């Protein structure tokens, strides 16, 4: 079998890091428009090890203001890929998000009931359902990551996450891929505040308290299942 992977969204932050860690093809949006089944079908003539689906409209505000477009990409795009991958007996690895949870309780496990707090989270959850329904061989990875720069002078001390920087999360995802894990998995690093995360790359970051009652302050994922499955593997 070919050891090469097919990656959608390869030009994004996560895709850029995965390209450095895996042998893969990363067609452009023009070459591989996931909303056009006829256009993407040609790429599946090759024998890939798996399809890694990253492409999405991930800007929450843009998604909320362009609901039809984000549904087309984030939901119907998943449907198109899952159906074709299933026809080819190809495993699909879908990168989902912690935004499928409301962010109120925290420590969300794979068995907790999703309840998205916004339209972006809804479309990503609907994408998960498309993968589950249309594909026989799948892995859904719920995770969250940050670019390698904290873009603000302050960071919240009372908002908690299991996210980490993209270079860290990309390596965790590659471990998951290479272990050929099936089904649903939450990937991240231990719970920390935004301030603690920001301090990892900027020691001069200032503290701030989030006083917005509607802001999701506990979106961290339970990663116990992942810790058991990953073992001591490193990239």
Explain the meaning of each model-derived region.
Residues 80-115:
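Conserved Rossmann-fold NAD(P)-dependent oxidoreductase catalytic core, especially the SDR/UDP-sugar
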Residues 35, 65, 69-80, 114, ...:
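Glycine-rich NAD(P)-binding loop of the Rossmann-fold in SDR/ketoreductase-type enzymes
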Residues 23-43:
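Adenosine-cofactor binding site in Rossmann-like domains, unifying the SAM/SAH pocket
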Residues 172, 179-218, 222:
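Mid/C-terminal beta-alpha module of Rossmann-like enzyme folds, strongest
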Residues 137, 143-150, 160-188:
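Alpha-helical substrate-binding/gating segment
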Residues 2-22:
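N-terminal Rossmann NAD(P)H-binding glycine-rich loop of SDR-like oxidoreductase domains
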Residues 37-73, 84-86:
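NAD(P)H-binding glycine-rich loop region in Rossmannoid oxidoreductase-like domains
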Residues 87, 115-144:
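Active-site Tyr-X1-5-Lys
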């Amino acid at each position: 079998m070919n050891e090469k992977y097919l990656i959608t969204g390869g030009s994004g932050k996560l895709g850029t890091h995965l390209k450095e860690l895996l042998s893969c093809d990363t067609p452009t949006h023009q070459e591989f428009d996931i909303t056009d089944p006829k256009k993407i079908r040609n790429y599946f003539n090759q024998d890939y090890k798996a399809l890694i689906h990253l492409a999405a409209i991930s800007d929450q505000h843009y998604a909320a203001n362009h609901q039809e477009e984000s549904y087309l990409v984030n939901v119907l795009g998943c449907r198109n890929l899952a159906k074709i991958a299933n026809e080819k007996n190809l495993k699909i690895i879908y990168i989902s998000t912690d935004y499928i949870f409301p962010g109120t309780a925290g420590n969300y496990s794979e068995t907790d009931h999703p309840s998205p707090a916004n339209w972006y989270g809804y479309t990503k959850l609907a994408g998960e359902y498309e993968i589950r329904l249309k594909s026989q061989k799948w892995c859904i990875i719920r995770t969250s990551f940050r670019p390698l720069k904290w873009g603000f002078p302050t960071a919240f001390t009372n908002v908690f996450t299991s996210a980490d920087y993209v270079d860290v999360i990309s390596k965790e995802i590659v471990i998951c891929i290479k272990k050929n894990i099936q089904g649903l998995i939450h990937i991240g690093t231990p719970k920390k505040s935004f301030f603690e995360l920001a301090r990892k790359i900027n020691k001069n970051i200032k503290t701030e308290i989030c006083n917005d009652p509607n802001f999701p302050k506990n979106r961290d994922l339970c990663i116990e299942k992942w810790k058991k499955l990953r073992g001591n593997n490193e990239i």
